[in-house]
Structure formats: structure tokens, C-alpha cells
Amino acid sequence: MAFGKSLFHAIGRVSLVRQIAAGLALGIVIGSVSPQLGLAAGLFGSLFVGALKAVAPVLVFILVAATIAQHQKGNKAHIRPIIVLYLIGTFSAALTAVIAGMVFPTHIVLAGAGDVSAAPPSGIVEVLKSLLMNLVANPINAIANANYIGILAWALVLGAALRNHGSDVTRQVVADLAEAVSTVVKWIIRFAPLGIFGLVSSTIAETGFGALAGYAKLLAVLLGCMAFIALAVNPAIVWWKIRRNPFPLVFTCLRESGVYAFFTRSSAANIPVNMALAKKLGLHEDTYSISIPLGATINMAGAAITITVLAMAAAHTQGITVDFATALLLSLVATVSACGASGVAGGSLLLIPLACSLFGIDNDVAMQVVAVGFIIGVIQDSAETALNSSTDVLFTAAADLGRQRNRAE
């Protein structure tokens, strides 16, 4: 018994990032050496992601409602500058992907890529309609289905009603509930090393690395664009806001948010992680409690890259020449589509036919491109989610620190 306690204390003294790195390395080894054991270990990953997904909608609803309920008049949340950063970042990602698609034209083999059963949206109007319908969804259904647009809308309305008509005791109860749910999130995050171990070992056991070899150039363009945004464009945007070296903040967000998101492959599941990081960075709670869930819905730089690169690859494969005006239009369409990706089943991949329609590409061909996206999804979806989610907290921090700098001046 004493040995067990001392072992747990010893593990507890090791930083969580190092524990995750150990879980990652062990997962790669187990998944490669013993696929059967790796698949069995996948249960730990499923439980971890399931726990995060389960707590995230409740956390967002209660935290936002509590924040608004206790919001004092004259104490602004400063959300607008963050939304502007989200849109700038997403458009920059789409434009970068267009340029990369022109400089490094990619042809893909479509025959035998597989079938995709889900139906893509027919146009921008349908994407926007989906977002608006999510806004007025039943609040219970919104929480049950992790509809964050609906959750945010109802939490804002309920919080405003409590602020104006609730008693001090009622508002304190809601605040205590928010603190309790945040504590539960901390407990879940402590199991991240075990969860990452399960996710990695099962992924390696199921797919190996061979399935990705045939699409190496396409993956290189996708990952290259995402790396350029994460390590060049985003730091430039952050510097513009805070006017000092942005890389310590950038690397902190990539390390403490991006790593989780890469393996969970879920922006929703990463909301609690981003909330905890924002609190650790000392950001304004009234701001991050709203901007981070909102970012998980509309801040989609990774999705914009995926939509654009695969649409450009489809055009090159079909022998279509893309002029600059069309490429610029594609950037705008990809930006709007990416912002609506959370409202579409299948996310960014099923918005590819929408972008392909700009080039007059047949829907059957576009859906084969989507199927290719699912094949490379093991890497593409992980990298996309890591970029999307880490940027949520990065831009929130940049806007908050920039506001503090302006106030100090």
C-alpha cells in the first residue's frame, strides 16, 4: 500500500506534458509491436475522449451562464477583437493554401478511393441556414448533441436573465456549479497520459503508416500549410497585437493545447483544456469563457486549409487551370465554409464539394476527393484540430494581452 502511494506521488511530481510524451512513445511502441494489444488499449483513449466530450457542453453552458450572470455593468468582455482575429486567421490560412496549391500543384488518384455515404451541403446558403438553426435549437438537445452555437446562445440568454432578475443567492449557486464542473475537468485532464497512450496505440494498430504513403505529396502540402500558419502567420498576428516576441506564447499554446487536440481530434473535447490554459495564463475570465467555445465553432484555419488544398488538388487532377481571381474567390468561400464546418456533419471534408463547385467539378468527382480526405484523415484531421484549437486560446490571449498593453500606454 505504501509502495503504491509513493509511486503515485512520484508520478504526480512529473509534469503532465512529460507524462503525455511518455504515453505517446509507449503507444507508438505497443501499436507497432502488438496491434492486438494496441487495439485493446484503445479503450483508454475512448474513455478519455468520451469523458471530455461529455463534460465540455455542460462546462460551456454553466461557465458562460455564470460569467454573464455575474457580469458587472461597465466590465466589457472584449469579444469583438477576438472574432476579428479569428476571421483574419482563417482567411490567411485559406489564402496560404491557395498559394501553396499553385506553387506545388498536386494530382491525386481518385479511382478506388471509396464511397462516402453522407450528403454534402448544396451551397453557402445551406451552411449558413444550418448555423442559424443551431442557434435556436432546443437547449436540452443542444447540450446533449454538443451544439455549441445553441449552447452559447442559451447560456448567454439565461445568464443575462439571471443577472437582471436572479437573486444574489441564485447567482452564487450558478458560480459554485461552474467551479465544481471546472474541478471535474481538472480531474479528467489528469488522465490525459493514459488517454493519449490508448489513442495512439489503437490508431497505429488500426492503420499503420502504409495507408498514408500513396498520398505523401498531398499530406506534405496540407501539413506544410498548417505548419506555416502555426509558426509564421499566427506569430505575426500575435506580434501585431502584443508588440513583443510572440513565440513563447505560441509554443505554450501549441504544447499545452495543440498536443491534446492532435490526439483527441476534437475541438469540443479540447474546450476544457483551453479553458484551463486560459486560466493558467491569467486571462480575463469574462472574455475566455465566451471566446474559446465560440472559437471551437467559428475559428477554423485548419479546416480552411483542408477545404482549399483538396479543392485545388481536384482542379489540378481534372486539368483545370485556376486563375488568380478564382483563387481569391476560393479563399473567401473556404473562409465562410470553414466557419460553418461545425454545423455540418463530417466537418471540413464534406464542404470540399462546395469549393469544387467553383471550378465546375462534377459532384461525383468531388465526393471521391472527399473519400481521399477520409483516407488521410488520421493525420489531416489531427493536425487540423491541433491548429484550430490551439489558435482559439492563442488569439484570445493575444487580444487580452494587447488590450492590457494599450491600457498601460
From Swiss-Prot:
Stored InterPro entries: Na-dicarboxylate_symporter, Na:dicarbo_symporter_sf, Ser_Thr_transp_SstT
GO cellular component: plasma membrane
A biological process term (GO) from this entry: threonine transport
Primary location recorded for the protein, binned into one broad class: membrane
Catalytic activity: L-serine(in) + Na(+)(in) = L-serine(out) + Na(+)(out); L-threonine(in) + Na(+)(in) = L-threonine(out) + Na(+)(out)
Recorded topology in the membrane: Multi-pass membrane protein
Keyword 4Fe-4S appears in the UniProt entry: no
Keywords noted in UniProt: Amino-acid transport, Cell inner membrane, Cell membrane, Membrane, Symport, Transmembrane, Transmembrane helix, Transport
GO MF annotations, alphabetized: neutral L-amino acid:sodium symporter activity
Transmembrane segment boundaries: 24-44, 48-68, 82-102, 142-162, 194-214, 218-238, 292-312, 319-339
Highest taxon above the source species: Bacteria
Location in or out of the cell: Cell inner membrane
Stated family: Belongs to the dicarboxylate/amino acid:cation symporter (DAACS) (TC 2.A.23) family.
Function: Involved in the import of serine and threonine into the cell, with the concomitant import of sodium (symport system).
Record's protein name: Serine/threonine transporter SstT
Gene for this chain: sstT
